[in-house]
UniProtKB/Swiss-Prot annotation:
Gene3D superfamilies: 1.20.1270.340
Coiled coil: none
Protein name, entry field: Replication restart protein PriC
Pfam family, one: PriC
Designated gene of the protein: priC
Species this chain originates from: Cronobacter sakazakii (strain ATCC BAA-894) (Enterobacter sakazakii)
This protein's domain notes: Known ssDNA- and SSB binding sites are adjacent in the 5-helix bundle protein.
Summary of subunit composition and partner proteins: Monomer. Component of the replication restart primosome, which is composed of PriA, PriB, PriC, DnaBe and DnaT; DnaG primase associates transiently with this complex. Interacts with the C-terminus of SSB. SSB interaction is required to load the main replicative helicase onto substrate replication forks. Interacts with helicase DnaB alone and in the DnaB-DnaC complex, probably 1:1 binding with DnaB.
Function: Involved in the restart of stalled replication forks, which reloads the DnaB replicative helicase on sites other than the origin of replication. In vitro can load (E.coli) DnaB replicative helicase from a DnaB-DnaC complex on a single-stranded DNA (ssDNA)-binding protein (SSB)-coated stalled replication fork with no leading- or lagging-strand in the absence of other primosome proteins (PriA, PriB or DnaT). Binds SSB (tested with E.coli protein) and ssDNA. Complements priC in an E.coli priB-priC double deletion.
Taxonomic lineage: Bacteria, Pseudomonadati, Pseudomonadota, Gammaproteobacteria, Enterobacterales
Record keywords, A-Z: DNA replication, DNA-binding, Primosome
Amino acid sequence: MRTPLLLQSLKTRVAALHTLIGPLASQRHFSPRFDRQLFACRGARLGDYLTEAEESLTHLEAAVNQGDATRVAWLAERLAAQIEALQREAATATLRRHENAHLPGGRLHARLAEYQEYERRLLAMKNEREQRYAERHDPQLAREITALDERLTRCRTAIARTERALERITR
């Protein structure tokens, strides 16, 4: 039966998407990013849309358990489209970082997006090093992981400082 394989594949893609979008999840957007047919939520954060995709996966699992083939097909197609849309949005996050530079606080928003992109890249590098370290316990990899942790700490400090500056402006 292909349904369990499809369901497992979609679960894997949603988990990968969660890792990809994690650092971008709290990033605010000023305009809607997705079609109303694709996402019911109108949230200002990418994490809201990721949550809806995870809910779609839960609904799909329920439909599979109930044996409703038409609903399974529709939900699977919709979830795949949601995943693709979120992947495209994550890929274009760096291109959009300056889109609101003319608005009050726009430069701060651009800087925040830049720092969040740095954080995403540092997390990816750290995860890659940790996977390699788990395979072979190389002391050089341990030093690299420590250095990446320190860089992540500085990056997160910069993100927090920029968010506080944005809060002061928007009061």
